[in-house]
Amino acid sequence: MPTLEWIGRDKVINHHQEVPFRVLERKYSFDESGQHKEDNGSNNMIIHGDNLEALKALLPRYEGQVKCIYIDPPYNTGNEGWVYNDNVNDPKIKKWLGEVVGKEGEDLTRHDKWLCMMYPRLRLLQKLLSDDGTIFISIDDNEQANLKLICDEIFGSSRFVAQIVWQKRTSPDARKRMSNGHEYILIYANDPDNLERCINLIGLDETDAGKYKNPDNDPKGPWVSVDFTAQGFRPNQMYEITTPGGRVIGPPEGRCWKNLRDVFEQYNSEGRLWFGSDGNGVPRQKNYLSEKEGKTVWTWWTNEEVGHTQEATQELAALLERKAFDYPKPVRLIQRIIQMATSPDSIVLDSFAGSGTTAHAVLKMNMADGGNRKFIGVEMMDYAETITAERVRRVIAGYNKGKKSIEGTGGNFSYYELGEPLMLDSDHLNENVGKDKIREYVWYTETRQPLPKTASNNDYLLGSLNNTAYYFFYEPHQMTILNYEFLSTIKEKAESYIIYADRCALSDAELMRFGITFKKIPRDITKL
């Protein structure tokens, strides 16, 4: 498999492992009762901060849990006039490049910069994707080729599903000699060999449903017909049949019937064959609208089906009562993705949240089908509160679109900022983040699972997994010692024990006898 090389690659290829783990600090919650400081328990999140650090912060709760990821990263067009700088020359990105890539960063082309920015973020997104998850990435011609190569490397070329072509305009730009009317969406699935786990059929629209008719008043309802013949010669599919009008016929020349005689007899007895209005034609098989589960997804998405950029701009301006973004994505486009890639209780992540289209689409889908999908949106720019979160607030509560009142979808979310790092530069625990955050982190580094919310008689028990009990014997303001006194507090029966403490007073022989692995705080706490 080809490997893409660029200046700075060696500095960023494992950088996701060096990103400091920061805690997420909830600032407020919002629901149908409005905005408030009390935690409403919402699993919907809008996070303001560097998405590289935010993705790292999500790992303890969400590694391997996200069913659908959609991202719309900067396209690297070199245009500095957009609200979202699209040439990776944003001061925050430039500062990060200087720190990570070093002196080489001064010689980076804009393509090098873009690849340095994207690579570690994609590595963390891959960790968050569930076994049956799918990632969708919007891009245009500026970086499509580079994106495909690094995605093949990170996700695996065998997991590439398709490249969607989205018709983003309704007409050519007459000011240009050559007008670009499309963008791409790259799709990778974690289980491509069982694609039905990852990709759903999509629903029929009014145009599709309008193709179904019922000229014979079939009690099963409207239908479309398909050919009941097939190419080739198969002796057991060359039988004669008698039409309802009494004509005896065989297959057309050069063809055979589609199925064996017993299948034909079954279909005929069930009224599933159409012989034309006179009852003497070559049979066609009826496919009923009522039995249609959906339709196959095509890789060509027209603006009539899923919207266009002008629609999206007008949609957002009407919602916020001002022009806030130049090129947002239409809600219908993201709804198509959610319909393809989620079940009613899935988690949807967008780490380039922008104007909040993905959260808007999730809320609309839940309203339409009664689902309980959860959204996580991450936005590094300062408009995370004034545009991203404000849009979601209005979608939940309802808003006015001109003289028309748009009903709220209902729902809720909590707004987060990136907090302090959990580990200080001296490799000591940052006690300011609180014991609960530290416990959650330690459990995750041991098990790669979210910390269970189960009551225990021992405050130091994190939980049990695979017959191993995990204890984090930690107090911010005093030394903790693994000794017989602490062992007497352990009531959890397990085959083995992993116990964190500041010191250990037990001998190696005693640890072995009790099946204990001692881990020293903070030395043995794994860095993500």
Ranges and model annotations:
Residues 49:
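Cofactor-binding loops of NAD(P)H-dependent oxidoreductases
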Residues 64-82, 151, 348-363:
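Conserved proline-anchored active-site loop of SAM-dependent methyltransferases
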Residues 39, 106, 110, 318-322:
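Short amphipathic alpha-helical segments at helix-loop
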Residues 84-109:
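Aromatic- and acidic-residue-enriched carbohydrate-binding clefts of CAZyme catalytic domains
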Residues 1-38, 43-44, 52, 58-67, ...:
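Accessory, often C-terminal, charged low-complexity segments
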Residues 40, 75, 88, 99-101, ...:
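Catalytic cores of nucleotide-enabled group-transfer and carboxylate-activating enzymes in metabolic
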Residues 92-100, 304-313, 362:
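Active-site-adjacent bridging/hinge elements
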